[in-house]
């Protein structure tokens, strides 16, 4: 708003917006951020799912919904032990992405898909990801037992 653009109201600044983030979640988010940065350098995707340091999925052309559905369908033998951390979905803008017209977006449907995939939460690059209906996202995260974290 300070610059005259209402879009900034949709781009949360850093902080935990719902739930609680553990040290394991912090480590998974750092790993996912590194993966997403690497994906961005070759213009592949804006998201990754990481659990206990293991990459379970990366976002590509089919998008976030398809990626999270794929994680939900993983057999238990291919998933890390949920007792040691459920993992997270991380989303960020690609390096060099035109932030005037092409920002990544999250919304309530993303949280529902993350919960269906058995994840512990959703983290995203603070100030660079549009959050549609943030009050509903916060409420829904609480209802679903997820954290929602704008990672700075």
Predicted regions and their residues:
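Conserved mixed alpha/beta catalytic, RNA-binding, or beta-rich assembly cores of soluble enzyme
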Residues: 1-111
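C-terminal binding/interaction regions
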Residues: 108, 112-151
């Amino acid at each position: 708003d300070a610059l005259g653009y209402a879009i900034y109201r949709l781009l949360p600044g850093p902080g935990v917006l719902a739930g609680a983030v553990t040290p394991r979640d912090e480590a998974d988010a750092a790993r996912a951020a590194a993966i997403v940065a690497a994906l961005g350098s070759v213009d592949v995707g804006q998201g990754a799912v990481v659990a206990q340091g293991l990459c379970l999925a990366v976002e590509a052309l089919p998008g976030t919904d398809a990626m999270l559905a794929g994680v939900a369908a993983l057999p238990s033998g291919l998933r890390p032990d949920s007792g040691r951390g459920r993992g997270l979905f991380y989303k960020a803008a690609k390096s060099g992405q035109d932030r005037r017209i092409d920002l990544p977006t999250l919304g309530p449907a993303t949280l529902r898909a993350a919960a269906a995939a058995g994840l512990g939460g959703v983290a995203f690059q603070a100030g660079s990801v549009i959050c549609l209906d943030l009050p509903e996202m916060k409420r829904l995260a609480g209802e679903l037992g997820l954290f929602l974290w704008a990672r700075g």
